[in-house]
Amino acid sequence: MDQVTRRAWAYVSRVAEPPNQLLADLVAREGVVAAAERIRSRNVDRRLLRATEARHEIDSAADDLDVLDRMGGRLLTEDDDEWPYLAFTGFRSADHEKRPHALAPLVLWALGPSRLRDIADRSAAIVGTRAATPYGEYVTADLAAGLVERDVAVVSGGAYGIDGAAHRATLASEGETVAVLAAGLDVSYPAGHSALFHRIGKHGLVVSEYPPGTRPTRRQFLTRNRLVAALGRATVVVEAGVRSGAANTAAWADALGRRVCAVPGPITSSASVGCHVLIREEKAILVTRAAEVVELVGMVGELAPDRGRPACELDELSSKELAVYEALPGRGARSVEEIAVTAGMPATEVLGPLTMLNVRGLAIQEEGCWKLAKR
C-alpha cells in the first residue's frame, strides 16, 4: 500500500464515527483516495456532509500513522489478505433495521504477530462482567486453557474481570488471543491492563476500529462489541448481569448468526443472573467445558436463527443524546463547538441533545459552556 493510499485510509478512519454506511459506500464506489478528497472538498452527499462536518478539517493521518509505525503496528483494510472476510459476512445478513450498526469495519488498526484472518477461522469469544467472582475467573481460566489445547484462539474485549482472565489464561497456556479495544491502540484502557495489552501485542493481536489517541466512550464499547462477536465463531458468556456489555455482545453474536453459549453459576450469585436468563430463555446454549465450545465452533456453518432480541444495554437516551453525554468532560466544561468535535456531530445538532440532557438533570450550562451535572 503506497503512502497516499495509506494516509487516505487513516483519514477516513477518523473523519466519521464508525461504523458509517454512507462513508463505506463512498469508499467502495470511488476508492479511498478519491473518497477522502471528496470529503475534504465537501463534494459528498448531504447526509455524509453532516456526518463528517465536525472532523473533516482535522487531518491527523500522518501523525496517526507515525504513532502506529513507532508501535510496530499495521493498518488493515479489506484489500489486505489478512482481512477476515468470512468473519464479517454475518454483517451482510443481519437485520439492519433493528441493528443499523451491523456493519463491517472500514479500517482496523492492529498490533501483534498473529494474523487476524487466521485467528478468526478458529476462534471463540469469552466475555463477562468486570466484577468477576473467584468462581467466574476459575471457570474462565479453565475454558481458555481448554480452548488453547484444541488450537482455538480466544477473543475478548480487554476489560477487567472475565475479559482479562480470558486473555491472561490464554497467554499462560501459550495460545493466541485477540483484544478488541474501544480506544486507540496507544490508549491503555483500563490503565491497569497496560502490561497485559503489551503482552498481547507481543504474542497475540490487539485491534481497534479507532485511530491512535481515541479515548473510549460507552457508545464505543457497545459498537466495539459487534466486532468481538464477529471475530468469535462462538461467544461464551461466563458471568454477566441482565443489562451488561457481555449481554450486549451475546445479542450481537446472535444477530450475526454466531453460536451463543452461557456458563451457569450459583443461583445465589448476582454475577450469574444474566447467564441464567440467557439459558432459561433459550438464547444461549449451556456449556461447562471447553470441549462443548469447540463442538459448537465446528458448527459455525449452521447459523443460529435471528430471535429478534432487543439491545441489552440501552438506557432512555437516544443515540445522539448518548454521544453528546459522552463528549462532556469528567471535569470542567466544554463549549458547544468542542462537544461537537468530540461527538463527531455538527454543532447545530448538539444543542437539542444538550437541552434534553439538561431536562433529565444530566448536564448543566454555565457561562456559555456545558458540563456534567453533579449526581
Set out the residue ranges of the language-model regions.
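Short, small/acidic-rich helices and loops at N termini and domain boundaries
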Residues: 1-96, 360-369, 373-375
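Glycine-biased, small-residue-rich flexible motifs in mid-sequence functional cores and linkers
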Residues: 1-5, 17, 79-375
